[in-house]
């Protein structure tokens, strides 16, 4: 749900019509109806008494680790050879990987695309912003997810029920490298302060059970990381196809485009 302090606001109207449009576009595949309701002050809600309305809506939750393992399982059932933890020293645009030759090479390596192209002396047509996102696992139970603005008001934060605990995130920090991301103290403070700004009963650092971080490969478009492109770009150099950007939700679209590129050769 999205909580609101004011009974009427531009944000309220924007999100109300936004979730209704999503439901309309989803048609019969909609997960459920959205609802705007008053928040009762004496209810067992976790929110502070400042909030008067909440917009409830349904969304899906994805376990990317389990999905990845399931995709590997499906690939093996189709007799696709998968080599994990297998080091590759070099590749080129003519389909050569180390000492072997292939019809096509698809470079789908997330934030490492530009790095590996440069390592193999291949010009990268796009620059990448390495944007770190960090999450906290809190020793707190909530009945449903909450979407709210952080204390800087530049992006939204989600607090989601997670295996009897709460998953809180995410941050958006530009980093120099995608290697070994981890949460820093400023991110931790930002998430805690943001969450406490809407809670009836504040939490402390003692409620943090664990944390994790990842790096998103966003196509660079300026100095403001918030305006970096969430889209993807496919670069083709002869038999080498390189993917810039993208995410789980755009993976099917990327796959279809790559199949089209290969079939049209």
What does each model-identified segment do?
Residues 39-78, 171-178, 237-245:
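Helix-loop-beta segment of a Rossmann-like dinucleotide-binding subdomain
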Residues 98-104, 108:
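Core beta-strand elements of the Rossmann-like FAD/NAD(P) dinucleotide-binding domain
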């Amino acid at each position: 749900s999205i909580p609101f302090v004011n009974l009427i606001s531009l944000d309220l109207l924007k999100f109300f019509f936004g979730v209704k449009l999503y439901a309309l576009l989803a048609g019969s595949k909609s997960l459920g109806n959205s609802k705007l309701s008053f928040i009762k002050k004496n209810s067992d809600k976790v929110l502070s008494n400042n909030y008067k309305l909440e917009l409830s809506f349904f969304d899906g939750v994805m376990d990317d680790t389990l999905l990845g393992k399931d995709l590997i399982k499906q690939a093996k059932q189709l007799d696709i050879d998968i080599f994990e933890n297998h080091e590759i020293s070099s590749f080129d645009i003519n389909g050569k990987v180390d000492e072997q030759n292939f019809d096509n090479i698809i470079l789908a390596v997330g934030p490492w695309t530009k790095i590996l192209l440069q390592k193999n002396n291949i010009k990268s047509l796009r620059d990448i912003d390495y944007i770190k996102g960090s999450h906290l696992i809190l020793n707190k139970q909530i009945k449903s997810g909450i979407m709210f603005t952080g204390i800087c008001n530049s992006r939204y934060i989600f607090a989601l029920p997670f295996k009897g605990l709460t998953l809180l995130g995410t941050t958006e920090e530009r980093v120099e490298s995608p290697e070994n991301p981890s949460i820093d103290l400023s991110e931790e403070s930002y998430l805690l302060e943001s969450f406490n700004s809407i809670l009836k009963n504040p939490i402390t650092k003692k409620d943090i059970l664990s944390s994790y971080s990842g790096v998103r490969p966003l196509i660079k478009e300026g100095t403001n990381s918030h305006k970096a492109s969430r889209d993807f770009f496919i670069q083709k150099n002869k038999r080498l196809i390189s993917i810039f950007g993208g995410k789980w939700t755009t993976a099917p679209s990327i796959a279809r485009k790559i199949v089209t590129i290969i079939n049209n050769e």
